[in-house]
């Protein structure tokens, strides 16, 4: 799933959620919910359901073997279902015929992806919330702290660090709202059977779908979405936007923390940010992680959009490509969110250096120009804006 280089750009939590064991466990949760729902409606014997449910425990399975065999099968679900049947047969051979009954591989895999994505989304929302709180606190504290406003990387006039902080926070607030709006539509149960009609469910497909969705805490679909990927991809697009907004914050921090600028610095701790042979340096590791995520997210999102035209009822290749692109996007989004949730609460702000940089610009300009564009009295406009925006964003 990940390389050694992916590891330090990610979080251990998200890597674990999308790990082999977690995905197999999520598919087993699908199979248990399926058997439970079908038995409750009389489609399969209760004794068979109990045998299946009791066997859907990831510790009973050789996950590494399932993953190895998936390459030959072309699907993670196929060797998983075979292994589940083999294991159920050890306890109740009559129940084997009811394992995975009436559904298809994509049902299990899409549902599993929704389950593990939900776990990581909760972490992303938590960490982005921490970042927003930190930024709004900084904005309130530094509403009146003068700062050079830079356009096209050049000093342009006076703003305040508070305005900068609300400018960082506002897109994150909007992203959280949009994520919460699109997530319920994306995090849906997948259940369509072989061609999406649930023909094997004896007319009880909608009831089974509702029971399973409630069991798993997912949204119940009105029909299968095997090749209707719009709501799923919409969630991916929102994650891409979030990563871009976090990357903008990180890029500003990197520029402001240069020795020549020295206006902010990431928090420091033993073993973090120190170079291999230059003890005088402190590298902005958290910002580096967020910038790396922002560099990679556009390609991931573009790939999700590219594979949306999926043929007929089930796709050969496009869906599989989507599966490969999805985890790295979500994982890097959480890596970025976690990094900024570390950096912003402990961000070191050097207001004296901010003032000194303004003085240096003023000294380099004719007095009339300096007084027009870099008079410290201009900060009152920024202060009012920062205070107003903090109140709006906290509302």
Where would I find each of the regions flagged by the language model?
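Short beta-alpha connecting loops at secondary-structure transitions
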Residues: 15-19, 65-67, 272-289, 311-328, ...
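Generic, well-ordered alpha-helical scaffold segments in large soluble proteins
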Residues: 33, 37, 83, 87, ...
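A structural signal for small-residue-enriched, beta-sheet-centric alpha/beta enzyme cores
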Residues: 105, 208, 215, 219-223, ...
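Short amphipathic alpha-helical segments with heptad-repeat character
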Residues: 118-125, 129, 136, 166-169, ...
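Glycine-rich anion/phosphate-binding loop at the beta-strand->alpha-helix junction
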Residues: 175, 225-312
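Amphipathic, heptad-repeat alpha-helical segments used for oligomerization and assembly
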Residues: 218-239, 316-317, 368-373
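Long, amphipathic alpha-helical stalk/connector segments used for oligomerization, subunit docking
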Residues: 296-367
């Amino acid at each position: 799933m990940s390389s050694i280089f992916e590891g330090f750009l990610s979080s251990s939590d998200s890597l674990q959620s999308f790990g082999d064991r977690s995905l197999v466990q999520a598919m087993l949760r699908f199979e248990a919910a399926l058997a439970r729902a079908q038995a409750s409606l009389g489609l399969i014997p209760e004794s068979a359901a109990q045998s299946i449910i009791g066997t859907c425990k990831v510790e009973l399975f050789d996950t590494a073997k399932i993953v190895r065999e998936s390459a030959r099968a072309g699907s993670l679900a196929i060797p998983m279902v075979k292994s589940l049947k083999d294991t159920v047969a050890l306890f109740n051979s009559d129940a084997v015929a009811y394992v995975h009954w009436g559904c298809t591989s994509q049902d299990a895999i899409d549902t599993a992806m929704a389950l593990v994505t939900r776990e990581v989304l909760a972490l992303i929302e938590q960490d982005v919330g921490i970042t927003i709180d930190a930024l709004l606190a900084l904005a309130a504290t530094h509403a009146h702290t003068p700062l050079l406003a830079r356009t096209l990387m050049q000093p342009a006039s006076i703003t305040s660090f508070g305005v900068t902080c609300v400018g960082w926070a506002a897109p994150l607030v909007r992203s959280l709202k949009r994520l919460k709006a699109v997530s319920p539509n994306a995090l849906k149960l997948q259940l369509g059977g072989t061609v999406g009609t649930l023909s094997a469910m004896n007319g009880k497909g909608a009831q089974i779908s509702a029971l399973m969705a409630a069991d798993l805490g997912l949204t119940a679909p009105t029909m299968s979405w095997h090749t209707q990927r719009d709501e799923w991809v919409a969630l991916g697009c929102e994650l891409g936007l979030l990563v871009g907004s976090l990357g903008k914050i990180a890029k500003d921090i990197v520029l402001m923390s240069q020795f020549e600028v020295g206006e902010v610095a990431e928090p420091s701790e033993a073993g973090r940010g120190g170079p291999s042979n230059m003890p005088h340096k402190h590298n902005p590791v958290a910002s580096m992680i967020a910038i790396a995520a922002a560099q990679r997210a556009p390609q991931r999102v573009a790939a999700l959009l590219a594979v949306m035209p999926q043929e007929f009822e089930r796709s050969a290749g496009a869906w599989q490509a989507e599966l490969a692109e999805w985890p790295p996007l979500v994982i890097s989004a959480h890596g970025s969110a976690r990094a900024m949730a570390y950096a912003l609460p402990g961000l070191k702000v050097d207001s004296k250096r901010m003032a000194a940089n303004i003085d240096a610009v003023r000294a380099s300009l004719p007095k009339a120009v300096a007084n027009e564009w870099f008079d410290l009295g201009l900060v009152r406009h920024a202060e009012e804006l920062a205070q107003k925006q903090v109140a709006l964003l906290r509302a």
